[in-house]
Amino acid sequence: LAAVNEEKLRDFGDPEIATRIAQYELAYRMQASVPELTDLSDEPESTFAEYGPGSRRKGSYAYNCIMARRLCERDVRFVQLFHMGWDQHKTLPKQIKGQCSDTDQPTAALIADLKRRGMLEDTLVVWGGEFGRTVYSQGTLTKTNYGRDHHPRCFSIFMAGARVQPGMTYGATDDHCYNVTENPVHVHDLHATMLHLLGIDHERLTFK
């Protein structure tokens, strides 16, 4: 296929053919790099100990955190991790323990790992979701079973790396965590901050 494309490029000199050749080559390089990327046999035991239980299990959050670091090492520009199942309208006491166990250690390990390798200055880590949960319970309240409802009025995210000022909090809620009372942040403000940290002027991307 490459030989045919090169022949057509010589015959017609069409820049779109050259672009298509480059796309095919990039796609091949990306696919060819996957086996090496996903082979964790070169990781020392200390890596798995740092990222915690489950870090050897493919598809687990801890495993994916290691994969995220390996992708960043290979200059992948954007990496997104998911951890599902936070919609706890009931059985929250049981579920939240498992989810925190899944995410706390690997998340901290990923940030520490990036910093130790000198990569955190050039990497922006953003942790968040699409909304928060109510501070009050939902459903029948017992010691072992209750839930929390959707709460889009206020919630928290955190950012690390990319010259983010560490240890700083911004914004506040009322005593019931129901409404924002200080320094509300619109999603556009969040986007502007993220773009600024990446060296991009957000106003050049803003259109009415």
Task: Describe the predicted segments one by one.
Residues L1-K208:
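Ligand-binding pockets and gating/stacking loops
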